Curated annotation (Swiss-Prot):
This is Serine/threonine-protein kinase chk1. It catalyses: L-seryl-[protein] + ATP = O-phospho-L-seryl-[protein] + ADP + H(+); L-threonyl-[protein] + ATP = O-phospho-L-threonyl-[protein] + ADP + H(+). It comes from Schizosaccharomyces pombe (strain 972 / ATCC 24843). Serine/threonine-protein kinase which is required for checkpoint-mediated cell cycle arrest and activation of DNA repair in response to the presence of DNA damage or unreplicated DNA. May also negatively regulate cell cycle progression during unperturbed cell cycles. Binds to and phosphorylates CDC25. This leads to negative regulation of CDC25 and prevents mitotic entry. It is found in: Nucleus.
Amino acid sequence: MAQKLDNFPYHIGREIGTGAFASVRLCYDDNAKIYAVKFVNKKHATSCMNAGVWARRMASEIQLHKLCNGHKNIIHFYNTAENPQWRWVVLEFAQGGDLFDKIEPDVGIDEDVAQFYFAQLMEGISFMHSKGVAHRDLKPENILLDYNGNLKISDFGFASLFSYKGKSRLLNSPVGSPPYAAPEITQQYDGSKVDVWSCGIILFALLLGNTPWDEAISNTGDYLLYKKQCERPSYHPWNLLSPGAYSIITGMLRSDPFKRYSVKHVVQHPWLTSSTPFRTKNGNCADPVALASRLMLKLRIDLDKPRLASSRASQNDSGFSMTQPAFKKNDQKELDRVEVYGALSQPVQLNKNIDVTEILEKDPSLSQFCENEGFIKRLAKKAKNFYEICPPERLTRFYSRASRETIIDHLYDSLRLLAISVTMKYVRNQTILYVNLHDKRKCLLQGVIELTNLGHNLELINFIKRNGDPLEWRKFFKNVVSSIGKPIVLTDVSQN
């Protein structure tokens, strides 16, 4: 899109996300305040669906988001406008990035950290439901963080009004992501109860770094086993949960929506009402630096033990489907507009006079590949904000001193072992590998691996997700990087 629009009151910066017919860009005003602005190409949108249907959906999304404005755990809606070509929606920019980018797959986060974030999630959902609004698409991609590490619920694209002026109605649109969707979603359902179910799956994922099943259908393996044990599972990884966490999760994941916990039951559960050191009286983060440090200390990629296997693989040893989706003609065009959090400018070559070691010593992503406790403690001593330790940029990246040709050869070898096909493109000083695959839950993962020369004999290799579950994308990143290993992956800032 053009960098200037008639009557658009902001300066347009870099793109941070894309959708089927929308693009999200960082924009800033004359006071340098940053916003996330969603631009919808009206011609493209109305070519994919009836113009009237699209207009109603867009109006509903905006109206319901505005209705839920004003809560600290919901992304703020500022305004919307349009011209003949574009419709734009101005939203709060979540400077802390994506919560689930900071969670280790198959490991999860510490229970007190999970309790803090789940309490904020339920505060946001309680507020939405008090307005009669069901989100209906609660999943990791829609849970963001602000600059102090507080949780923000985003994306009202599937939201619906289930209650108005004291009168409730059942909903009937089968929406949401399969691993997080309630079993009754294919029938008429209570919008508030499907949100509770999704929150239960999210809490499970926070604590254990995975979802309990592909989807809640009675003939699928993991969910069938759950049902056979009368929804009181004792097998791995359920047996890793504390009694309190087990109680609240199983209460939220009752297949019968009439027996399932309501939001009121959830927020009054003893596990959630117990104190946590991270929570202030008003529910905000009490110590952003300590919270960021705890999150980062859980992230670890052991390059001394290369592996291509997921601990709960179902398709093959890698955990990814052997039959990968073929690229469609439009896929590469869509992937050219990739999702990248961070500064308003693209990565550029570093100044020749810059001390590269000093730059790398401040990059938290390096802590994944070393004994990270000392690394994180050094950062924490100087940090004043959450994002100085947990950056908004995705952590699925690494540096290398190897030549680009060598790095690409190793990437291709690793992706071949995972049975993932790749296409490649050159853009200025970058090489971009386009990847398209299904994760072990049979959900689509799309993104790019972007190689950028920073100068100083240094390459940045960035795995940038466009579509899919952040936990599964990080698992894919770990599998690839672990198979590449040392000395390609830079683990020591003094490494030559």
